[in-house]
Amino acid sequence: MQTAENIEHLNFQAEANQLLKLMIHSLYSNKEIFLRELISNASDAADKLRFEGLSDAALYESDPDLKIRIAYDKEARTITIIDNGIGMSRQEVINNIGTIAKSGTREFFDSLTGDQAKDANLIGQFGVGFYSAFIVADKVTLTTRRAGLTIEHGVRWESGGEGEYTLETVEKPDRGTEIVLHLREGEDELLSSFQLRSIIRKYSDHITLPIVMKKEVWDDESKSYRLSDEDETINQASAIWARPKNEITQEQYDEFYKHVAHDFEPPLAHVHARVEGKQEYIQLLYIPAHAPFDLFDREHRHGLKLYVRRVFIMDDAEKLLPGYLRFVRGIIDSSDLPLNVSREILQESKDIDSIRAGSVKKVLGLIEDLAMSDKSEDQEKFKTFWREFGQVLKEGIAEDYSNRERIAKLLRFTSTHDEREEQTVSLDDYIARMKPEQEKIYYITADGLKAAQSSPHLEIFRKKGIEVLLLCDRIDEWLVANLNEYTGKSLQSIAKGNLDLGKLEDEEEKKEHEKEAGDFQELTNKMKEVLGEQVKDVRITYRLTESPACLVADTHDVSGNLGRLLKSAGQKVPDSKPFLEINPHHPMIQRLKYEEAKFADWSHILFDQALLAEGGQLEDPAGFVKRLNDLLLQNILSGK
């Protein structure tokens, strides 16, 4: 018997109140998800018991038949979900339920869109699925006992979803968790065997352990159906990945994805394969239709679910796929790994290395199929894939040398070919449009598309009709540092080193350039003397047709864009100075040859303008403004 003294009243954290209100008021049109989420949690609890039971069979407590039971009571207006999984201790209840979503709660709210379907998807993704119960219930009572604890260590948690909850210690003979939902007014349609079965078959048919309800039988006396004492399994209760592919519908594949990925939307694509030979395993891998909130958090644990002979071993087995494929969801079920496999064993396992290589091959093949398909539906899917995951795939150029060529073939960029913001140009597209004499793939990196498109470095390339790739993602500097060539064509930054257009430049142009370099030698020396340590050197350029000057990094130096990225990330930037290149045909440069009084000011203005044009920051903005104002004033006065 429990007394009031046993009951502890606690408050949710502040953000929990917002979350509960969201569940109740914002997701009502998707209210069926409450049962999906609670069944999914029950399934996870059974998986955890199976895993811990490998090393401690006593946890089963003479009850090895794992299942989930769904019941309803029309008179009490309740729905009950019972599992005999691992259960929770008092502290686990506080940690997992009293402290909503822990570190993910703020990100959850930041990610809300106002679209009910999309926001419903976020519930499972952020680990707050339990609270979907409050969509249909005005009171939730959870009673649980962790496997291995004695019956007097049961815990009862109860809340009306109004910002506080109660905890009490109770006796619970059976391990596992029982959740009773006291339905809100107007939710009586859920108190129907047909309705609950329909929801289970729609959302949870893939769950691998039985979901049971009491069987309905016809009662001749009352001329209606009544519940019998006989159990009936509602779902197929078998591992979907172990079934033949021709027996699985697309809807079943999609529902299983939603379960393993905690997603509300169907996936973009999937691959299901059984591998036999030296290694025997099954892989069911999915590419999501949208990026998760933590995609770029490489420290956050990502990975696949690992099973051994249908027994769940672990979530987030990151060793099964490389980091650049961390967006992939799904399962690997091995026939060869030991049941007591640990994360430490995974690090050293050659079997895992083989599974990893096979999984990478399948995922890249799936992406290639979308990229090369003639079907408009697949082409749209690839565009979605690239928009959501393209930046992450680029990491593979540095991480996965053995698949570098395959990954490079999948890369997409913006280019000067059509200047569209959407990244649609492949390296193969670029090569197919190269001029006959062209030997290199030209690119420029910048911190945004507008900055790249307006870069003065493009001027000679636009004049000669040479296409240039515009690389504007933060990862692109890392990409080109690790991708030196593609199918025999070297990649060349147009903002680094001496400009060498090779056969694209005729002999007469080269002779003219050599002559001009001599004619302007005195000017470049004088400018170098004025600018001092700001530049490595000043030299004539032929890459400009409209601008008076630009900055160029030395061949092996850090580019200005990369330097700014490193600085913004708090990393040390290697000490290097740019070249200032001047356009001998520009009126300002030709006038500067004969300027004496304002030569230093003009030289500094040219350098500062070039620095601003490439997205850099001035060391002395006030000095730049003063020199520019003096120049403008001089022009105005001379005009009078």
UniProtKB/Swiss-Prot annotation:
Gene Ontology molecular-function annotations: ATP binding; ATP hydrolysis activity; ATP-dependent protein folding chaperone; unfolded protein binding
Protein name: Chaperone protein HtpG
Task of the protein: Molecular chaperone. Has ATPase activity.
UniProt xrefs under CDD domains: HATPase_Hsp90-like (cd16927)
InterPro entries per record: HATPase_C_sf, Heat_shock_protein_90_CS, HSP90_C, Hsp90_fam, Hsp90_N, Ribosomal_Su5_D2-typ_SF
Chaperone as UniProt keyword: yes
Region spans: A: 1-343
Region (B): 344-564
One Pfam family this sequence matches: HSP90
Keyword vocabulary terms for this entry: ATP-binding, Chaperone, Cytoplasm, Nucleotide-binding, Stress response
Subcellular location, record wording: Cytoplasm
